[in-house]
Amino acid sequence: MARDLLKGAVEGRFFRGNLHCHSSRSDGLLGPEEVVVAYRDAGYDFLCLSDHFEEEYGWRVTDTRALRDENFTTILGAELSSAPWEERNAYWVTAAGLPPDFGAPPADDHAEAIRRAADLGAFVVMLHPGLNNLPLAAADGLPALDAVHAVEVYNHNCAMAALPDRSNGAYMLDGLLEKGHKVLVNAGDDAHFGHPRDRFGGWVEVYCDQLDPDALLDSLKAGRYYWTQGPELQELLVDGDRLRVQTSDAYAISLTTGGDRWLCGSERHGEGVAPTTEAEFDLAPFRGSYCRVAVVDPTGRRAWSNPIWP
């Protein structure tokens, strides 16, 4: 019997959200309410305002609960670090789903906050490894790595600012997957509202039965979502070794993995060629490993599924 990897057994709909952005409570330029209004007015359904959780900002979680309404919700969270920023191989995470009174870590163990966040039920995303020049060779020794649920493979602020070559974290995602870590994929704006194009460029579409912070977190941790710059992943149906993909208009739909294995189920090249909206793949070549669906639309915007373990 076919199973839908995007929706599971849940009856619901997709909700658009961003898990990585900042306000004037840390190093962003707009106040929390202004940030929430900007995302709500741009058609988003939810937001995690992930201000930096550091001593210089008072070790506080920005409380956005008063900004929720019946059509837009917020997830409390913060950007945590594994070590002081100047330390070699420090890394940063969004912890989405923190209590408002989340306390500071011990001075000699910043990573304790990451472990504690996961223990409290937060969805933990490793952020911008490319921006931080975090080497894959250091991954096995990273503190609290077992608390990380997902890796940010696209950081829109980096892509739109002066660091486009640092916006890609796919090397870390694939490296961790090849080492046996079952991590998910993620993307975020990292918006600081410091220039006109640092927002609304990479988000998650989360399949859920209700617009509720706890329900959204459950879906995120279960992998019932995909990241996108615009293309829609509408269906990922697995039946035995066959994977059927339904999308919005696409220039290409492919199935890929780390290393040198990839399959391209549907491609459309050249002027005037009609886009595709579906593809079918054989999962057998990926048995014992993993793969993911990648979509490129006619304007070059991308979407990725979470890893699939056949």
Where are these regions (language model features)?
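A metal-dependent hydrolase metal-coordination microenvironment
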Residues: 2-129, 133-146, 152-173, 188-195, ...
